Amino acid sequence: MRFKQYDIVKHFKYETLTDEQKKQNIYLYQILAFPVKHTETGEELVIYKALYECHENNMDVNLGQIFARPISQFFSGVDTVKYPNIKQEYRFELIKHMDSEIHNSMITHCNLTPPQRKNRI
């Protein structure tokens, strides 16, 4: 699956959240740029930002915090041995296509709730 700049994606750990946590957009991100080359190694990266703030359960993420992850890891499948109860197939999956960056002040006004997922066969 390929994403575009500004797409909203969810991390597979979204499935582990309570309904209340899901309302806070935890584990939802917006892709800012890819591919981006690491200046030292030449490795291709995805640059993305958090659409939530969370400082509990071993998480320390600020709203709008920027992350970089190698493309190969970003597009990798979920390790079903380590996470046997996860139904999502890939580490990140598309929620919504967007045409521009969502600014932090707009996040609470956007409907970012993922649609209900059909069970994988």
Model-identified regions with their sequence ranges:
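Residues that flank catalytic or metal-binding motifs in active/ligand-binding sites
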Residues: 5, 27, 44, 88
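Conserved beta-strand residues within beta-sheet cores
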Residues: 6, 28-30, 68
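Short beta-strand-centered aromatic/proline hotspots
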Residues: 18-36
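Short acidic, Gly/Pro-enriched loop/turn segments at secondary-structure junctions
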Residues: 37-43, 81-85
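Short solvent-exposed strand/turn elements
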Residues: 39-63
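Intrinsically disordered, low-complexity, charged/polar segments
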Residues: 55-121
